[in-house]
A protein has these predicted regions:
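Single conserved hydrophobic/aromatic residue that forms the stacking wall/gate
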Residues: 204-208, 212-216
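Short linear motifs at protein or domain termini
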Residues: 1-103, 207
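Conserved amphipathic alpha-helical segments that form helical-bundle/coiled-coil interaction surfaces
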Residues: 86, 104-168, 181-189, 197-203
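Short, flexible turn/loop "capping" segments at secondary-structure junctions
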Residues: 66-68, 136, 178-180
Length: 216
């Protein structure tokens, strides 16, 4: 069963479909290899087939779905090589962001990050994976913005769904508490302005969940 969020004010039908489908693909409510039922999804989303098909074409270009003429449309399987490319890009950028954070972040910036981390405990206790995932995304987005690199974040975010699926799957084989501890260690290194430790911890944090998800 897919989850459908409310349509935003002034959001086009295509953008709405795109956002909802990406969210459900990332969170594996639409599973890898699953066939999309166009008439049913159009009815659930309250849109006509034209914007739905426009969204499908964009998802196909982003390699999140596969359109098979006269057969159907399927959620793409996880492509290990593509995930590794995205992981490598993120690792390079985010290790540099972690190093920059040691230099640039103010006490107020660091407090914002600690506020994010503080919420993890509640959602870990409730085993709410999607909330934890949102906090994880929010933590990294904050770091990019605080370091003055929002364009870097946009670059990564465009490719993120491929990597994000492995992050969600990693929660099934790696306790969320471990990822929480990664964030605590990274934030402590940033707070202490330890560039070497922050760089190293960021690389480990990005690499381990992907490896576990792909071998599970």
């Amino acid at each position: 069963m897919i989850t459908i969020s409310e349509r935003r004010e002034h959001e086009s039908a295509k953008s709405f479909v795109l956002r909802v489908l990406i969210d459900n693909i990332i969170n594996t409510r639409l599973e890898p290899g699953e066939k999309l039922n166009e008439p049913e999804l159009c009815e659930q989303l309250g849109v006509s087939r034209t914007p739905f098909r426009e969204a499908e074409l964009e998802l196909a270009q982003r390699r999140l779905i596969e359109i098979r003429p006269k057969i159907g449309t399927y959620v793409s399987l996880i492509d290990a090589e593509l995930v590794e490319e995205v992981r490598h890009l993120r690792a390079v950028l985010e290790a540099e962001i972690a190093r920059m954070a040691c230099e640039k972040l103010t006490p107020a910036d660091i407090d914002q990050l600690w506020e994010n981390v503080a919420l993890w405990r509640m959602y870990i206790e409730r085993a709410q994976e999607e909330k934890i995932f949102e906090l994880d995304k929010g933590f990294h987005r904050l770091l990019y913005v605080q370091c003055g690199c929002p364009y870097w974040y946009d670059l990564v975010e465009n490719l993120a769904p491929h990597f994000d699926r492995t992050t969600i799957l990693s929660f099934r084989c790696r306790p969320a508490k471990t990822i929480y501890e990664d964030h605590v260690s990274l934030l402590k290194a940033i707070e202490q302005k330890d560039e070497v430790a922050a760089h190293r911890l960021s690389l480990i944090h990005i690499s381990e969940p992907t490896r576990l998800a792909l071998i599970s």
